[in-house]
Amino acid sequence: MPKKFTYAEAGVDRKIRAESKKALALLKRTYKFSRYGRVVKLPYGNIFPFSRYLYLDLVIEGVGTKVLVAQLANKYDTIGIDGIALAVNDLIRSGAKPLAVADNIHAQVSDPALVKAWMKGVVEGATEAE
């Protein structure tokens, strides 16, 4: 049986993370800033009033420890596919439809081959989601 890999072994301290997330409560002060109404808090995120009868569900997806798996397999397109799949899954829970993908990549190294594989995965994931 393979060895279990934990968040702690990947360098993630879940207690500190939970403590840090408490600071997000400060954002509630901004929930009334829209002229169209208040931000609606859902169990997994928030939706934002975009016009009188429309809401925007904004998803920011991180790849987290998936990078470790991609490095071990030397296969990076799966990061893009998975990122899109997770973002779309978050969107459809509120009844939203995907609108766009931001092209913001946070990577330790700017390796053109890695970025190309990653973007191929993003395109494949978006195509599958369509």
Whereabouts are the PLM-identified features?
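Glycine-rich phosphate/pyrophosphate-binding loop regions near the starts of catalytic domains
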Residues: 26-130
